[in-house]
A protein has these predicted regions:
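Long, contiguous binding/interaction regions
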Residues: 68, 73-74
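Short S/T/G/P-rich N-terminal loop/turn motif that feeds into the first structured element of a domain
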Residues: 1-51, 58-68, 91-101
Length: 101
């Protein structure tokens, strides 16, 4: 399984528009789980993430199918002009450290 996590920073006046643009992604069938969440900002750092996309995919082929879907491109078209920054990470769950090393 692959986890796909994307963080967005957004001006306050654009948060709901970006969330709506990201919500399009939930209609792509390639993900086994896909969530769009707003950061509750309990960390206390000055620069905080505003929105998060969290996805789970069976394998790299499923993630590639997700990124190749026309709705993925539509989401980018809507979100990119409104977001400030975007950071993403993908990792294989079976390779993740789950105990002290």
């Amino acid at each position: 399984m692959i986890r796909h996590i994307v963080f967005f920073t957004v001006k306050p006046e654009n948060v709901e528009k970006v969330r709506a643009g990201l919500s399009i992604l939930t209609e792509i069938p390639a993900a086994t789980r896909l969530e769009i969440g707003a950061n509750v900002k309990t960390d206390g750092f000055h620069r905080s993430i505003d929105l998060v996309v969290y996805g789970e995919f069976e394998d790299e082929a499923a993630l590639a199918a997700y990124k190749a879907h026309p709705l993925y491109e539509e989401s980018i078209r809507r979100v990119k002009p409104l977001r400030d920054e975007r950071s993403a990470a993908d990792y294989v769950v079976e390779d993740a450290v789950t105990t002290r090393v």
